Amino acid sequence: MHKEQLMKLHQFFVYVVKEIMDDNLENTDNECKKLFKIYEMLDIRPHHIHRLKSEQKAAILLLSACVASYLANNMDNVPKNLAKKLEENAFKHLNSCKKNIIILEENENNGESAEKEE
């Protein structure tokens, strides 16, 4: 995909995620909120033309993982592992461009959020 096409796709996913978050904030699951926080921490926006293609791809994959997570929780025919695979691919793209990010993870022991440097 060309960079301009990636930027348009990125903008599309931004609109979709904001629509989901605005209309259904109480129905939006924690996984989607966590992915959107990570996306915001990346500070990669559709209009940032100076960013690498791999960074744009990672942002798109994070947003699409958020959408997939929302759909999996609200529809029966969307597999729940789709969001996880998209999230894994996003981090793979970030690691390929040597981008260090902070990931908010749910601590399995007591439900508190913990910060981890990846």
Curated annotation (Swiss-Prot):
Entry-linked InterPro entries: UPF0058 (IPR002753), UPF0058_sf (IPR036519)
Pfam family, one: UPF0058
Family membership: Belongs to the UPF0058 family.
Protein name, UniProt field: UPF0058 protein MJ1132
